[in-house]
Amino acid sequence: MHVKKGDKVVVITGKDKGKQGTVLEAYPKKSRVLVEGVNMVKKHAKPSQDNPQGGILNQEAPIHSSNVMLVDPKTGERTRVGYKEENGKKVRVAKKSGEIIK
């Protein structure tokens, strides 16, 4: 998968198109990512020890990884991700600027 936890991404399609956020979690087997502040859904929660009031909560839902693009750390624009070997290790590279993605 081209994005990992902690990456800054921009949504390129769907109801949240244009929104930016960081990846909170990645689910590689399902090719989905959880992005901060994107794809908010209402969850109905029963009263519990943690939440004695219960009620309706707003939380993020996962979106498909093909609907997000990485934000280039150098230019701040969205970019595709490439891979190259450096010191015997496979590293991710921003296609627009050639910057190595940490």
Swiss-Prot record:
The chain's disulfide connectivity reads: none
Q: Which domain of life is it from?
A: Bacteria
**What are the record keywords, sorted?**
Ribonucleoprotein, Ribosomal protein, RNA-binding, rRNA-binding
Pfam family of this protein, just one?
ribosomal_L24
The GO terms this record gives for MF are: rRNA binding; structural constituent of ribosome
Supply one GO CC term from the record.
ribosome
Where does the secretion signal sit in this chain? Answer: none
The region called Disordered is annotated at 44-65
Q: Which GO terms describe its biological process?
A: translation
Q: Which SMART domains match?
A: KOW (SM00739)
State the similarity comment.
Belongs to the universal ribosomal protein uL24 family.
Q: Which HAMAP family does the UniProt entry name for this protein?
A: Ribosomal_uL24_B (MF_01326_B)
Quaternary structure, from the entry: Part of the 50S ribosomal subunit.
Q: Give a short account of what the protein does.
A: One of two assembly initiator proteins, it binds directly to the 5'-end of the 23S rRNA, where it nucleates assembly of the 50S subunit. One of the proteins that surrounds the polypeptide exit tunnel on the outside of the subunit.
Under the heading NCBIfam families, the entry gives:
rplX_bact (TIGR01079)
Show the PANTHER family listed in the entry.
MITOCHONDRIAL RIBOSOMAL PROTEIN L24
Protein name per Swiss-Prot or TrEMBL: Large ribosomal subunit protein uL24
Q: Which organism is it from?
A: Shouchella clausii (strain KSM-K16) (Alkalihalobacillus clausii)
